[in-house]
């Protein structure tokens, strides 16, 4: 494979020296970009965009052609695994993701297969290898998956949920059934991420979008335990380089110490944490990624720059910080504001790496 021309993202995750703080954005290939909207219209719908490696590659590279980002992230969806388990993923306009089949009994869970990354999710592996080839060493490629808990909520609720009542009822009424489901999902996520690494992903992130909705005890039992299991089963070195692992639990700021013990190289932070405080708590163990409130991008470029400066100052000197938003960039953001954000990170962070 081609040597990396810009490896500061990987270096920061491994707490090695960098010249400036690296930056990328969750959902950087997304609806805020007119070129993404054009590609999506051409593909027909969101799933066709995900399932066609050429389209997935095209939209992954769009933000990199526009901005000096330090990483690319595979364009896909966290729900590819449940779809490959036979649940029938589809998208309702205005409703988000739905499943044709819902998991409600132990028998449903027993019947679920563990997908084979090559056979059942080959389109994702093809997308990874295509993107990696097209990147030609420009920046590293991030692979990703949803966490077992987050995937389980969609599978049991049948789609998005405000209160996760069915999944939480299962956690308390029938924990053995939920553990069986989470165990199958942990196996599936491990092989899925390892497949992505072998196909060319140079770092991986686990998105635990709904872990922060659990109580502290339930988070340990139903979310963190399974992420720890995945991390211990991942390929950590490939092509002569370490493959860093990032864990991101949205609203998980109260539990950073426990998450930092899970074996990952870095923790993602949402915007409710103060990054300087997070560094004092766990910065000796892990790198940190984040954590500007995505809605700051609706403000004027000068205000965006000011908030970037504040977060950089809060983190302080030295490596171990990858700048990102605290969650995905939203569709209505002006692309110029995203550009102002990225430029501000590079321009204002150099002083912290001298």
From Swiss-Prot:
The record marks 77 as: Transition state stabilizer. Keywords: Cytoplasm, Decarboxylase, Lyase, Porphyrin biosynthesis. It is found in: Cytoplasm. The keyword Lyase applies. One of its GO terms (cellular component) is cytosol. It catalyses: uroporphyrinogen III + 4 H(+) = coproporphyrinogen III + 4 CO2. Belongs to the uroporphyrinogen decarboxylase family. PANTHER family: METHYLTETRAHYDROFOLATE:HOMOCYSTEINE METHYLTRANSFERASE RELATED, UROPORPHYRINOGEN DECARBOXYLASE. This is Uroporphyrinogen decarboxylase. It comes from Pseudomonas putida (strain ATCC 47054 / DSM 6125 / CFBP 8728 / NCIMB 11950 / KT2440).
């Amino acid at each position: 494979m081609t040597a990396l021309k810009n490896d500061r993202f990987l270096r920061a995750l491994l707490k090695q020296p960098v010249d400036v703080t690296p930056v990328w954005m969750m959902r950087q290939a997304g609806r805020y970009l007119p070129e993404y909207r054009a590609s999506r219209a051409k593909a027909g719908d969101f799933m066709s965009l995900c399932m066609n490696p050429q389209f997935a590659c095209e939209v992954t590279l769009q933000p990199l052609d526009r901005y000096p980002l330090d990483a690319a992230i595979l364009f896909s969806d966290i729900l590819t695994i449940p779809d490959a388990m036979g649940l029938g993923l589809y998208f309702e306009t205005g409703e988000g993701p739905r499943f044709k089949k819902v998991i409600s009994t132990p028998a449903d869970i027993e019947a679920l297969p563990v997908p084979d990354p090559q056979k059942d999710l080959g389109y994702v592996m093809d997308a990874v290898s295509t993107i990696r080839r097209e990147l030609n060493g420009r920046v590293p490629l991030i692979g990703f998956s949803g966490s077992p808990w987050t995937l389980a909520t969609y599978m049991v609720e049948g789609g998005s949920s405000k209160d996760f009542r069915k999944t939480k009822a299962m956690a308390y009424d029938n924990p053995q059934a939920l553990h069986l489901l989470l165990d199958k999902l942990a196996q599936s996520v491990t092989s899925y991420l390892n497949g992505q690494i072998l196909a060319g992903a140079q770092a991986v992130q686990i998105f635990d979008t709904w872990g922060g909705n659990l109580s502290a005890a339930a988070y340990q039992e139903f979310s963190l335990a399974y992420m720890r299991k995945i991390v211990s089963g991942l390929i950590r070195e490939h092509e002569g380089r370490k493959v860093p692992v990032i864990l991101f639990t949205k609203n998980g700021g109260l539990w950073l110490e426990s998450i930092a013990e899970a074996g990952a190289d870095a923790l993602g932070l949402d915007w409710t944490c103060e990054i300087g405080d997070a560094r004092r708590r766990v910065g000796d163990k892990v790198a940190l990624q984040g954590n500007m409130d995505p809605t700051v991008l609706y403000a004027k470029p000068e205000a965006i720059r000011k908030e970037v400066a504040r977060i950089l100052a809060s983190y302080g000197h030295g490596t171990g910080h990858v700048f990102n938003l605290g969650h995905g960039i939203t569709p209505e953001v002006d692309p110029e504001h995203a550009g102002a954000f990225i430029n501000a990170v590079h321009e204002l962070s150099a002083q912290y790496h001298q």
